[in-house]
Amino acid sequence: MKNHIMNMKTYSLFLDDIREPRECLTYLHDPRYGTREWVVARTHDEFVSTILSRWAEGEFPELVSFDHDLADEHYDPAMYHGVDAYNNKAIEFKEKTGLDSAKFFVQFCIDVSIELPECLVHSMNPAGRERIRQTLFDYERYQQRFGSNKS
């Protein structure tokens, strides 16, 4: 049977490495960023840990807001394409983005058979913002077509 959020304690979850929720008011004009009490996760790992630990306590977010760029070193022009131009060597980025967090969250909802709650994307990275939105939209479309129950 599908889990329902109405039977759980809820919270609002904000994923961003730098900003506070209230700062999003200046460009999104959504009053929820200024009026809600948010749980803030600064990294993908912190996001995952928050979801899992609060789920174990019978809590699930009723609202999630995603940033995309969680590690600014990925966007340093000297380090594009996985090459550290400062030291002339290949590098591997270890920090995950908000897209990884959105994918985790969608998979978590599938695994526990719960509907995806309302999700916002406050990222200022247009390509990253669109990829997160598309991931969430694809899952919502899947839910509408097939339901969220596991087979």
Language-model regions, residue ranges each:
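Catalytic phosphate/metal-binding cores of nucleic-acid and nucleotide-processing enzymes, i.e., regions
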Residues: 1-151
